């Protein structure tokens, strides 16, 4: 049976998602879990594939992989028990004939989180420049053979203390979303206007936009037009999520206090 799994991960521990010899990657951990369960012996013969690669430090809410196995029940029941705590499956589907997680995707959605957004309304207005089909050469590495991409939706909204850039497209170039985020961040800080994005999309490429830091990026969703059966998160991953949240809330508070002006008087009695 050709099984598809939707899964999430924190990207900070991995050297990207794509399999690399002697390096810890998301694919390497997933394939290792499949081998441990004897779902297949050779990942190539099992046609193991993912929807696309994410760089080191990039996270995923909805990555997708598929592979052939004659033990589908074992895969569905046990994968979450043997995967590391920072990778967990959230759904599964019996993949239709001809399915490939990369080439069968109808669209992909990414979110980029800005911790100090500035003018979010200006960022949202500038994000509309990305809509439609454009040459994104200025927003990707040099040498991409076909730099044209079609953006289906693009917006910036506020989520608590963060501004979130959410973009949906048929496909994306390497580092494209992070480069788009760089320009929106500049707009939010008043360092650029929406017209500069329009010029980068239509004019000759005189310079390429630098990519924003990877830790703010999440592969948010991939649409295949097929239903996935939800899978419950296992206890280990649930604890890991809670522990990470508590740690970062604590560190945010400590960092805020350490960043205060040292000339302020100490709190009495301490």
UniProtKB/Swiss-Prot annotation:
GO terms for biological process: tRNA pseudouridine synthesis. It catalyses: uridine(38/39/40) in tRNA = pseudouridine(38/39/40) in tRNA. InterPro entries: PsdUridine_synth_cat_dom_sf (IPR020103), PsdUridine_synth_TruA (IPR001406), PsdUridine_synth_TruA_a/b_dom (IPR020097), PsdUridine_synth_TruA_C (IPR020095), TruA/RsuA/RluB/E/F_N (IPR020094). Keywords: Isomerase, tRNA processing. GO terms for molecular function: RNA binding; tRNA pseudouridine(38-40) synthase activity. Substrate binds at residue 110. It holds the Pfam family PseudoU_synth_1. HAMAP family: TruA. It comes from Methanoculleus marisnigri (strain ATCC 35101 / DSM 1498 / JR1). Belongs to the tRNA pseudouridine synthase TruA family. The active site is at 55 (nucleophile). The gene is truA. This is tRNA pseudouridine synthase A. Its EC number is 5.4.99.12. Formation of pseudouridine at positions 38, 39 and 40 in the anticodon stem and loop of transfer RNAs. Disulfide bonds: none annotated. PANTHER family: PSEUDOURIDYLATE SYNTHASE (PTHR11142), TRNA PSEUDOURIDINE SYNTHASE-LIKE 1 (PTHR11142:SF0).
């Amino acid at each position: 049976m050709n099984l598809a799994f939707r899964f999430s991960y924190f990207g900070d521990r991995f050297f990207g998602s794509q399999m690399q010899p002697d390096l810890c990657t998301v694919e390497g951990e997933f394939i290792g879990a499949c081998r441990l369960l004897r779902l297949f012996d050779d990942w190539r013969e099992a046609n193991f594939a993912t929807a696309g690669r994410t760089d080191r430090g990039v996270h995923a809410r909805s990555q997708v992989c598929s592979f052939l196995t004659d033990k589908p029940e074992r895969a569905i029941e046990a994968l979450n028990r043997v995967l590391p705590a920072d990778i967990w499956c959230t759904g599964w589907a019996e993949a239709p004939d001809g399915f490939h997680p990369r080439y069968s995707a109808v669209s992909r959605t990414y979110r980029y989180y800005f911790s100090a957004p500035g003018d979010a309304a200006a960022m949202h207005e500038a994000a509309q420049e990305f809509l439609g089909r454009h040459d994104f050469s200025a927003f990707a590495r040099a040498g991409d053979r076909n730099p044209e991409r079609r953006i289906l939706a693009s917006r910036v909204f506020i989520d608590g203390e963060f501004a979130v850039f959410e973009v949906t497209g048929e496909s994306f170039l390497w580092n494209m979303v992070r480069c788009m985020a760089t320009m929106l961040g500049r707009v939010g800080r008043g360092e650029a206007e929406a017209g500069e994005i329009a010029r980068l999309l239509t004019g000759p490429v005189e310079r390429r936009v630098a990519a924003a830091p990877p830790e703010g990026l999440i592969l948010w969703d991939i649409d295949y037009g097929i239903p996935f059966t939800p899978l419950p998160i296992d206890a280990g991953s649930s604890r890991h999520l809670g522990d990470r949240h508590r740690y970062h809330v604590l560190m945010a508070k400590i960092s805020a206090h350490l960043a205060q002006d040292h000339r302020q008087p100490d709190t009495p009695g301490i």
